[in-house]
A protein has these predicted regions:
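Secretory-pathway/luminal and periplasmic proteins that interact with or process carbohydrate-rich
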Residues: 239-248, 264, 323-335
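Short, well-structured alpha-helical interface segments that form or flank functional binding sites
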Residues: 212-215, 225-229, 249-252, 287, ...
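Catalytic and binding regions of secreted/periplasmic enzymes and modules that target cell-wall glycans
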Residues: 288-338
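Substrate-binding/active-site groove segments that recognize
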Residues: 248-275, 290-298, 345-346, 371
Length: 380
């Protein structure tokens, strides 16, 4: 999606106005909001923020995006922002960026900084390799430097020339030196000199990621009565195991939870009280998997519980995870009772074919196909 379209959708959806906000005020506001969310300020100030803190944070995020869009477009001349399967992080006053594609496994670090370009590229490689798995330490929507020193989220996914996992400054710097010697490239990009390197994750990176989250997937799937192969299939389809996945809706994390819809339903189930999960909460893999499987449980046992056949219901749950249970039922009939009756009169295969043909949105129709195909690879 084009970055400007992305912005427009966010702004239309939120109704956020942009007048009267200067760049430094927006950045200061973002910083304050994050500190509040992370509990870094006094309780007197924090008590003035709504319980979830999500509405103010979302407004600030949207304002920041709107303020920075023209600056980024002017500097890079393209539309590269974070997406569900691609991590994008800008540093060096938006002159350097890292792009990690979790689907292909390609990693690209590039800079258009005209001064000390090789050093900036070297620094960008090191910070990318050492980006921590703790989401509170990484702001995808600013050019702030990454605070390293914790376990990197790429640990084990990238190996150096000794085939060793990279998790120390020494090893990251040495590998950056190697990349600058062997993979450095330069070209002319939108009238600017661009310096970049491209390297790759290990060949079986998605399997490695799946294994990393295996304990939590198994634990939460058993807890909520969800087949583990379905949980894995949804994670892969939604984010390709990108823990920093973020979409324009916005949805966050491995299972792409929308805070104000699935997030609220899952929060209520998990905490027995109303609430909305924050962005940083959903960027935590364990929390995200817990919420995602909880929402699958809600679809399975509440919204679509009247579907009698387990396999038929699973097809409906998969489609419902993407488009909502209401749209699933409307694919059969505008009346809920009649919709359930029609579903229960069909075989699982007939239901699958009907959904593939009659779901309102092409995305949902394709989603059902993708998840069921991926699911087969995770079946024992």
């Amino acid at each position: 999606m084009k970055r400007r379209t992305f912005l427009q959708q966010l702004l239309i959806a939120s109704g956020v106005g942009l007048s009267g906000c200067q760049p430094h005020e927006i950045r200061r506001g973002i910083s304050l909001a994050q500190k509040l969310e992370n509990g870094d300020v006094g309780s007197a100030v924090a008590s003035q923020i709504p319980g979830s803190g999500v509405a103010p944070l979302d407004q600030l995020v949207r304002k920041q995006l709107a303020n920075l869009i023209d600056e980024l477009a002017a500097k890079w001349g393209d539309d590269k922002v974070a997406s569900p399967k691609e991590y994008v992080k800008y540093t060096d006053k938006y002159l350097t960026r890292a792009i990690i594609n979790f689907e292909s496994g390609a990693i690209r670090v590039e800079t258009i900084d005209p001064d000390q370009s090789r050093q900036k590229l070297h620094d960008g490689i090191v910070s990318t390799l050492l980006t921590p798995e703790n989401p509170a330490k990484v702001d995808l929507l600013s050019s702030e430097a990454i605070e390293t020193g914790q376990t990197p989220f790429l640990k084990g996914l990238v190996r150096d020339t000794d085939n060793k996992a990279i998790w120390t400054q020494w090893r990251a710097k040495r590998y950056a030196d190697h990349l600058l010697k062997t993979a450095y490239q330069q070209d002319r990009y939108h009238d600017k000199d661009r310096h970049f390197v491209t390297f790759h994750m290990v060949q079986n990176h998605q399997a490695s990621q799946a294994n990393q989250y295996a304990d939590q997937v198994l634990r939460q799937s058993r807890r909520f009565g969800i087949p583990t192969d379905l949980t894995y299939a949804i994670i892969e389809t939604e984010s390709s195991f990108n823990p920093y996945a973020m979409s324009h809706i916005p949805a966050y994390g491995l299972m792409q939870i929308v805070p104000t819809s699935a997030g609220r339903d899952a929060y209520q189930l998990l905490h027995k009280e109303a609430g909305t999960p924050s962005k940083n909460y959903l960027f935590q893999p364990n929390k995200n998997i817990e919420m995602g499987t909880a929402y699958l449980h809600i679809l399975n046992t509440r919204y679509l519980a009247r579907v009698r056949d387990p396999q038929t219901r699973q097809y409906c749950v998969i489609a419902g995870y993407n488009t909502g249970s209401g749209n699933v039922l409307k694919a059969f009939d505008s009346n809920r009772d009649r919709a359930f009756a029609k579903i229960n009169a069909l075989s699982p295969d007939q239901t699958y074919q009907h959904l593939r043909q009659h779901l309102k949105y092409a995305e949902a129709r394709n989603y059902l196909k993708k998840v069921t195909q991926v699911q087969k690879r995770y079946q024992a």
